[in-house]
Amino acid sequence: AAHGVDLRIAILSRGPRLYSTRRLVEEAKKRGLDPYVADPMKFSLFVADGRIDILHNGELFNYDAVIPRIGHSITKRDVAVLSHLEQLGIWSANTGAGILKSRDKLHASQILARNRIPVPRTTYVRAIIDVETAVDFVGGLPVVIKVTQGTQGQGVFLRHTIREARNLVQGLLLTGRSILIQEYIAESHGKDVRALVVGDRVVASMRRRARGREFRSNYHLNGTVENVDLSKEFEEVACRAARVLGLHI
């Protein structure tokens, strides 16, 4: 099974044509696996005394392991599916609880800070009157303002004055968003490093750089990427962060 002889593996993804999903399928096939791409929206869960079952598209879901490709759009229903799979003894690359914790920027920061992993100074703001106090707490202007759940650079803003910060927070609060005001790290302006952790080691890392005056380095915002070698210290921080958030990948 270790070499894919009898291992039945499924990739949980709503986008079988997405690049990341296709690459997982390609690499699995190279290892002699025959992966099945399963839409997480098409599971039905069954619970009875002493017994649980799960169907996908009307058929019994009979797999040994799953790789969830469920990101920022994860719902309580997706978490229920992953929990059901875990109870059936089906190994999951990431648990529903782990994905939920990592997708919420506030919750993730709380967990990392509690485990003495360095994070930018952060405040969670629910009232306009607290904006100035929050800015002072994180070290003064400029500040980064974020919604707690976002990806690909969406919902991340840099503000240079109290008035700008207050106006933005007011607008976001009116839309029902949860808002973080965060310390601006000058040395990381327009660039950051991403590490891919699998199990207990970093298997790949890259530096992302923004184009022009953009301070967000996301590839989806036309940023560029390049290979980077991480120091042992950075690798250990990345692995610890994944571990305390409950993520295998």
Where do the protein language model's features map onto the residues?
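Glycine-rich, highly charged phosphate/nucleotide-binding loops
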Residues: 41-62, 72-78
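Active-site nucleotide/adenylate-binding loops and adjacent lid/helix of ATP-dependent enzymes
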Residues: 3-14, 19-26, 35, 46, ...
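Beta-strand scaffold of nucleotide-dependent catalytic cores
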Residues: 168-169, 192-209, 237, 241
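Anionic group-transfer/hydrolysis microenvironments
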Residues: 41, 71, 148, 184-185, ...
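Short, acidic/turn-prone active-site loops that include or flank metal/cofactor-
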Residues: 40-42, 97-99, 209-210
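A long amphipathic alpha-helix within ATP-dependent nucleotide-binding catalytic cores
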Residues: 175, 215-249
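Redox-cofactor binding/interface segments in oxidoreductases and associated redox assembly factors
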Residues: 67-68
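Catalytic core of tubulin tyrosine ligase-like
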Residues: 157, 171-172, 186-188, 201-214, ...
